Amino acid sequence: MAGRSLSHLQQLEAESIQIIREVAAEFGNPVMMYSIGKDSSVMLHLARKAFYPGKIPFPLLHVDTGWKFKEMIAFRDAQAKAFGFELLTHTNQEGVEQGVGPFTHGSAKHTDIMKTQGLKQALNKYGFDAAFGGARRDEEKSRAKERVYSFRDKHHRWDPKNQRPELWRTYNGAVNKGESIRVFPLSNWTELDIWQYIYQENIEIVPLYFAAPRAVVNKGGQLIMKDDDRMPLEEGDVESVERVRFRTLGCYPLTAAMPSEADTLEKIIEEMLLTRSSERQGRLIDSDQSASMEQKKRQGYF
């Protein structure tokens, strides 16, 4: 009897689950980064599948900048309660005391202090030797050249010229004390794969991904949702209610919405099949400077 061939999504699922299980077996203190977005939701689902019917054998970590959408935080807490995983949260208190924010200090400094430095603080605090991330190679050019097992030195820095070969899905997890590995089990997935898998597996995601009427401010052509009263209005800013959704999620002042009628998973998938724009075009942090994502990763960002 001929063996049953796996579908494209089943192959991706199997590869990711194998990576997650291998890290859990190989490392002494792994953690899964949980940014609450669609990729994190898929990665969480895969981790639950990998160890079912048992619990996920490592904690999930959310680095909270204090500027996430309120719906994201509510969703995070609801997911932790529903699935019973261990949720760790960390905020860079030094940044909070300094009043660091995207409006007062700019996107680059805010991202460095509240996200990159906050992440490194959390990794040092708990002594994690491996950290799962939901990055995919199709997202951005610096991520396209990153390994599944991405080696980081004792300062959490990434050197793209010092990467280990990964032949025949064989991964090298050897690290010295203080060093660590960032692991990307979704490396070979595309944005369309993510949405099709969410649809296939009926994975719950933050409602912000679905089109709905929302209060936004047009800032230089970017539609920024006014999520609270901390966003100052400047000359030329135009407030309105538009039918929009988010293709990617981050800190609300640094994440632009897009006009859309896609209010179901089927419509989002149809939109993905027709779009020719970058997934991260709404992430303002990517336009801070030339090669900004690679610079952030060299400094310790995911």
Swiss-Prot record:
Pathway the protein contributes to: Sulfur metabolism; hydrogen sulfide biosynthesis; sulfite from sulfate: step 1/3
Gene3D superfamilies listed in its UniProt record: HUPs
A single MF term (Gene Ontology): sulfate adenylyltransferase (ATP) activity
Record InterPro entries: PAPS_reduct_dom, Rossmann-like_a/b/a_fold, SO4_adenylTrfase_ssu, Sulfate_adenylyltrnsfr_sub2
Record-level GO BP terms: hydrogen sulfide biosynthetic process; sulfate assimilation
Family note: Belongs to the PAPS reductase family. CysD subfamily.
UniProt-recorded name of the protein: Sulfate adenylyltransferase subunit 2
Gene field: cysD
